[in-house]
Amino acid sequence: MRTTYTYNEGINFLRAVSILGIVLYHIFPFAMKGGFLGVCFFFLISGYLAAKKGQIDWDNESFHIRKYYIKKGLRIYPALYIMVMAVIAFFTVFHQELLLGAREEAASIFLGYNNWWQMLTQASYFMKITEHSPFTHLWYLGVEMELLVVWPLLFLLYKKWIEPRLGKGAIWFFVLLAVASVFAMGLMYHADNVNRVYYGTDTRAFSFLIGVVLGLKEDDWNKKGNILFQGDNGRALFFASLLVTIALFVLVEGEQAWLYRGGMA
């Protein structure tokens, strides 16, 4: 019997909250100072879905790295190409001065290393947000593409070698990777320049990895009938989490030290 994926409707709500936070941050950067944290939710969702779908493909004996890469490429590149070309065309006509270095930046976008390109060119996200740079936000896609390249290799290692030896304890492989990412962010943080830890794939991977852990363990938690996430307890936890998220979106500032010393996790 083939295993199928049942879509979690809560993901749509989490995406909506994340998008709202990010959009409001870009429209009102001084009023919605912490809206950029919505990006963390997108990485978490990506990791969760990667784990759920990876596990289903594994159970159905249909997990193939080559097919995975082709599928992801076909999902990302057509829309990305159209968007980048449309933006370049628009700014060529109306704001050509904002396209200085566009060729190098476009190459970094299509090759999936725009986050590192922005880091190396000292393009601070929190400074550029008020300058309306057309491609500032694509650092996120760079991190996402790099994580999606590494993910099937990690998953194959997990299923082929770690899980057969450690059983249910194998999940600690991803937990420890997430912890290492959080520690890396804290260790590499410098108050005068947060670019390295904000844009770095290694220092942003923890959100994706937390999502992976949630995706791989969700079925086990459901089978155990975990009352923490059910009924009144679940609703109370949901509203408490929503209030905390809204508070963070309003109160947090992008260059506060505690964020990079475990706060984003």
Where do the PLM segments sit?
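Hydrophobic membrane-embedded alpha-helices
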Residues: 2-11, 17-265
